[in-house]
Amino acid sequence: MIPTYMNIMLAFTISLLGMLTYRSHLVASLLCLEGMMMSLFIMATLMASNTHFPLINIMPIILLVFAACEAAVGLALLISISNTYGLDYIHNLNLLQC
């Protein structure tokens, strides 16, 4: 396997382990989730550049749009929780139910 792909998979794995380790705080979880999305974006970009199929070039852009939407929703949720409770613990998410 090419060392570049191994490094990207290692970055994804480290972000996944960080997500599992620091799952009690929303900020740490969002950062790890963003690291996972960025490693997936880089992997998709490398795959699209290696395969010369013209329709696959749009896939990294779609993934980047989903990552931006995920970041916006996560930050909005973080602001809502921190304004209401002053903490960023994930267990406060159950308190946001109507």
Swiss-Prot record:
<protein>
    <recommendedName>
        <fullName>NADH-ubiquinone oxidoreductase chain 4L</fullName>
        <ecNumber>7.1.1.2</ecNumber>
    </recommendedName>
</protein>
<keyword id="KW-0812">Transmembrane</keyword>
<keyword id="KW-0830">Ubiquinone</keyword>
<feature type="transmembrane region" description="Helical">
    <location>
        <begin position="26"/>
        <end position="46"/>
    </location>
</feature>
<keyword id="KW-0679">Respiratory chain</keyword>
<keyword id="KW-0999">Mitochondrion inner membrane</keyword>
<comment type="similarity">
    <text>Belongs to the complex I subunit 4L family.</text>
</comment>
<dbReference type="GO" id="GO:0042773">
    <property type="term" value="P:ATP synthesis coupled electron transport"/>
</dbReference>
<keyword id="KW-0813">Transport</keyword>
<dbReference type="InterPro" id="IPR039428">
    <property type="entry name" value="NUOK/Mnh_C1-like"/>
</dbReference>
<keyword id="KW-1133">Transmembrane helix</keyword>
<dbReference type="GO" id="GO:0008137">
    <property type="term" value="F:NADH dehydrogenase (ubiquinone) activity"/>
</dbReference>
<keyword id="KW-0496">Mitochondrion</keyword>
<comment type="function">
    <text>Core subunit of the mitochondrial membrane respiratory chain NADH dehydrogenase (Complex I) which catalyzes electron transfer from NADH through the respiratory chain, using ubiquinone as an electron acceptor. Part of the enzyme membrane arm which is embedded in the lipid bilayer and involved in proton translocation.</text>
</comment>
<dbReference type="GO" id="GO:0045271">
    <property type="term" value="C:respiratory chain complex I"/>
</dbReference>
<comment type="subunit">
    <text>Core subunit of respiratory chain NADH dehydrogenase (Complex I) which is composed of 45 different subunits.</text>
</comment>
<keyword id="KW-0520">NAD</keyword>
<dbReference type="InterPro" id="IPR001133">
    <property type="entry name" value="NADH_UbQ_OxRdtase_chain4L/K"/>
</dbReference>
<keyword id="KW-0249">Electron transport</keyword>
<dbReference type="GO" id="GO:0005743">
    <property type="term" value="C:mitochondrial inner membrane"/>
</dbReference>
<feature type="transmembrane region" description="Helical">
    <location>
        <begin position="61"/>
        <end position="81"/>
    </location>
</feature>
<keyword id="KW-0472">Membrane</keyword>
<dbReference type="Pfam" id="PF00420">
    <property type="entry name" value="Oxidored_q2"/>
</dbReference>
<keyword id="KW-1278">Translocase</keyword>
